[in-house]
UniProtKB/Swiss-Prot annotation:
Domain notes: The PX domain binds to phosphatidylinositol 3-phosphate which is necessary for peripheral membrane localization to the punctate structures.
Function of the protein: Involved in proper sorting of the v-SNARE protein SNC1.
GO annotation, biological process: autophagy of mitochondrion; intracellular protein transport; macroautophagy; reticulophagy; retrograde transport, endosome to Golgi
Gene expressing this chain: SNX41
Protein name: Sorting nexin-41
The organism's taxonomic lineage, starting at the top: Eukaryota, Fungi, Dikarya, Ascomycota, Saccharomycotina
Length: 625
């Protein structure tokens, strides 16, 4: 059994379950599905790393049961010496509480670990059942950072990650273990005594989450993340204070690099729907291929040039996701098959050992007490059978270690990389939504400008008509009626032609149309501020037209300011998200190489251990013959 994985659970139960702890420490089958899970005294205390960032070496495999037994004794003593961190009763209730303050501070006298660059590392050193300040039980994780201990619950890790996602929308936030469903909490709530494997897995992944966050400068410098690692801050109070409470509901309504400081214009920006992402490629191609008649459609050259890089990264990540998903399925399948093989080894060892014991029991006492017992053929056969069974036992234990490494070195890191890729796509989608927001503003501006142009043209035409009517008043009284009739005919023709041209100019490529009829031009309405798409221009008075023109100019001014802000946001998103995507790309490449090398070393060590064991058994049998 891997002590490093279940160390926290042993420590939690040491004060109340010393007998059980001692039994588990000497049992290599604990945590397996084998029938004989309580009979062979050994351990794999050095089989796995303390955390995911320091996987085991090939020398960690046990060479003999004696080595395993000594490791078991060492582990038991370590467990008793560290039981002071212990958590209280193991019959703890579950985890589905609201976020509680689990913070505690303690100065650590021992040296805090550092990496090769001298940077102080962060580590989760314990996990188990704790009591909060209100006396409730919860599963807590003890974080060691800067010589302080901070206890945080899983729900607090979850809320931290959600907050970081909103505070840093252009940064890929490292993943954490998935949250269990509410149904599972109802039927089988997490318990420190019964779910030690789940807790230890979360402990490793949360440790990886914190380490990855510290390696990302934007996250490590964030005030919320710093408060999370500060034992003096109550996490519940952090979530109900600035900057969390002043974040916008949607990051598209705030500056991407400083969402807590939006401008007044950010609040009136349009929000494109997520369903519009399906048409992103076609909209982008249309934008760069169709020559726009308006200068507002021109994006900065930097945005146009960077788009090909983002497309390449997205295609690369899609390919990574496809390969990793298939690889993860194969890993789980191979792990299951290898576990079956390990079970066969255990059964073979049990059969050989039982057979040797059976012959030993049925042997007459006279043969046992004989001085020439060493030369007795029956005793030699029993010894050979026992050595063979012992070899199968050792191979079984080594195989169980390798299965655990399948999880710690291969399956869990690969699954984490898959979550990294999913988070990368969210950042890419945020960038796409910002461009779609730009396209909405662009369309609104073009519509407003078209309306303003039509309204201005009509105003100019009506002024010409009024001037023509004014000139007719200087005619003599005798010709006044004829001149008036002629002018009215001219007015009707001019209005009809104007109506056609206005209708054609406003309906081409836009939803709203402007119509002019043959009714009186000075018709007054009871709603002078009614939208132009609901009220025909012919019904507007001169004052109403002037008001509409003024309103359109104001709207256009705001929309153009919004467009400038949107373009500025796009530039910031491109720069920040590109750096984050490249950081993730490098992290994935390095992690995959590290995973393959470590697992190859572990598999090679397992093969060597098996070969060494069989050679030793053969040598002992040959010497006895």
């Amino acid at each position: 059994m891997d002590y490093n994985i279940f160390e926290a659970v042993h420590e939690q139960q040491s004060s109340t379950s010393d007998m059980d702890l001692s039994e588990e420490d000497n049992n290599p089958f604990v945590g397996t599905h084998h029938l004989y899970a309580s009979g062979i005294g050994t351990t794999i205390g050095e089989a796995r790393p303390e955390n995911e960032n320091s996987p085991p070496s090939s020398s960690s495999l046990p060479s003999s049961p004696a080595h395993s037994s000594s490791a078991g004794s060492s582990r038991a003593s370590t467990s008793s010496s560290t039981s002071s961190h212990a958590v209280v009763e193991a019959d703890a209730e579950t985890e589905p509480f609201v976020s509680l303050s689990m913070s505690t501070t303690a100065t650590i006298s021992k040296f805090t670990p550092h990496d090769m660059n001298g940077t102080q590392q962060i580590q989760i050193i314990d996990a188990g059942d704790f009591k909060d300040p209100w006396g409730k039980h919860a599963i807590g994780y003890v974080i060691l950072y800067e010589n302080n201990k901070i206890i945080r619950r899983y729900s607090e890790f979850h809320s931290l990650r959600q907050s970081l996602t909103r505070l840093l929308p252009t940064i890929i936030i490292p993943p954490i273990p998935s949250k269990h469903s509410l149904l599972k909490y109802i039927w089988s709530p997490i318990n420190a005594a019964n779910d030690s494997k789940i807790i230890s897995t979360r402990k490793k992944m949360l440790n990886s989450f914190l380490s990855n966050c510290l390696n990302i400068q934007e996250i490590s410098n964030d005030i919320v993340f710093q408060k999370f690692l500060n034992p003096e801050f109550n996490w519940k109070d952090v979530l109900s204070s600035s900057p969390i409470i002043i974040l916008p509901l949607n990051n598209l309504l705030a500056p991407p690099l400083s969402p807590t400081k939006p401008s007044p214009l950010h609040s009136i920006l349009p929000i494109p729907s997520n369903s519009s992402l399906r048409n992103y490629n076609s909209i982008w191609q249309q934008h760069i291929t169709v020559k726009s008649h308006n200068e507002i459609s021109n994006l900065p050259t930097e945005i146009l040039q960077n788009e090909s890089q983002f497309t390449h990264i997205e295609n690369l990540f899609q390919n990574y996701k496809r390969i990793i998903t298939h690889l993860l399925k194969n890993i789980r399948s191979n792990k299951s098959h290898f576990h079956s093989l390990s079970t066969y080894f255990a059964e073979l060892g049990a059969y050989y050992n039982a057979f040797s014991l059976e012959n030993d029991i049925t042997m007459p006492n006279s043969l046992r007490e004989s001085e020439n017992n060493s030369n007795n053929p029956m005793m030699e056969i029993i010894s050979h059978i026992e050595k063979t069974g012992h070899s199968f036992d050792v191979i079984y234990i080594s195989s169980e270690i390798l299965i655990e490494k399948y999880t710690s070195i291969l399956e869990d890191p690969i699954n984490e990389l898959l979550q990294f890729l999913n988070e990368s796509f969210k950042v890419l989608n945020f960038k796409k939504l910002k461009f779609l927001q730009f396209k909405i503003l662009e369309r609104l501006i073009i519509e407003k400008e078209t309306k303003l142009s039509s309204l201005t043209e009509i105003e100019n035409q009506l002024q010409k008509i009024n001037e023509s009517l004014t000139r007719s008043t200087i005619l003599t009284d005798e010709n006044y009626k004829d001149t008036k009739a002629a002018d009215l005919t001219f007015v009707k023709k001019d209005v009809r032609s104007l109506s056609k041209s206005s209708s054609n100019s406003s309906s081409s490529g836009h939803q709203n149309e402007i119509h002019i009829g043959a009714s009186k031009l000075n018709y007054k309405t009871s709603t002078p501020t009614m939208n132009l798409n609901k009220l025909e221009i012919k019904q507007l008075t001169e004052q109403e037209r002037s008001k509409q023109i003024k309103q359109l100019n104001q709207d256009l001014s705001k929309l153009k300011d919004c467009l400038s802000i949107c373009i500025s946001d796009m530039l910031e998103i491109n720069n920040s998200s590109y750096n984050s995507l490249m950081h993730t790309y490098n992290h994935i490449n390095l992690t995959i190489g590290k995973i393959l090398k470590l697992f190859a070393a572990s598999f090679k060590a397992w093969i060597k251990e098996c070969l060494k064991n069989w050679k030793l058994a053969k040598l002992q049998i040959d010497e006895a013959l």
